[in-house]
């Protein structure tokens, strides 16, 4: 079976039923821009470690290569799971480009205080206090609602996230089950 046939007939319909919209948007983009042009017309059993290594070596950025490989790997693993492919090249030693070192910028305590003081009395003050002080992911901070704050108990309930996907807002459950949590208010 050609990879493109599997994508159109089996894998993409599975994705539309089981994955978050933001994940689907990323998968579709990686498929259209990177995976399909190289492997779409190939039989799934013809895709080899050597071909994948050569393909990955031609990417301009490590991030794009890693995302495209993640999508190709997901496709091939689903085909194996559904008994449509016998050889699992995804478990072999695929050579991914080195990830550039990422050092997040973290506000110092002094910078946090200055930021919070600048928002004193602002309608977003409570939101900013929670987001800064509780270490929320960006989408978790965007998803906060007043009902998530329990002033009597002094806790904040992280119940959802808010993402901007394909030009519209999407409310999503927390990224992982451990992300659904209750935090002490500052």
Where do the protein language model's features map onto the residues?
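N-terminal core-binding DNA-recognition domain of tyrosine site-specific recombinases/integrases
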Residues: 3-4, 8, 12-84, 101
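Short, polar loop/linker segments at the starts of domains and inter-domain junctions
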Residues: 18-25, 106, 166-175
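Active-site/catalytic core of tyrosine-dependent DNA strand-transfer enzymes
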Residues: 29, 109-110, 153, 159-167, ...
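Short aromatic/basic micro-patch
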Residues: 46, 106, 182-184
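Basic, Lys/Arg- and aromatic-enriched nucleic-acid-binding interface segment
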Residues: 62-70, 81-144, 152, 163-164, ...
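C-terminal catalytic core of Y-nucleophile DNA break-rejoin enzymes
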Residues: 152-157, 171-186
């Amino acid at each position: 079976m050609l990879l493109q046939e599997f994508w159109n007939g089996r894998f993409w319909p599975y994705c539309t039923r089981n994955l978050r919209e933001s994940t689907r948007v990323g998968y579709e983009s990686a498929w259209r821009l990177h995976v399909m042009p190289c492997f779409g017309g190939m039989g799934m059993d013809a895709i080899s470690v050597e071909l994948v290594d050569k393909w990955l070596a031609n990417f301009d950025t490590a991030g794009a290569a890693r995302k495209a490989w993640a999508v190709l790997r997901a496709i091939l693993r689903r085909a194996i799971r559904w008994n449509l492919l016998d050889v699992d090249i995804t478990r072999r030693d695929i050579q991914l480009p080195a990830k550039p070192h990422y050092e997040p910028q973290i506000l110092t305590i002094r910078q946090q205080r200055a930021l919070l003081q600048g928002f004193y009395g602002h309608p977003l003050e409570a939101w900013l206090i929670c987001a800064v002080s509780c270490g929320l992911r960006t989408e978790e901070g965007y998803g906060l609602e007043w009902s998530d704050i329990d002033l009597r108990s002094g806790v904040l309930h992280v119940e959802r996230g808010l993402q901007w996907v394909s030009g519209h807002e999407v409310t999503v459950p927390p990224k992982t089950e451990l992300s659904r949590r209750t935090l002490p208010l500052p």
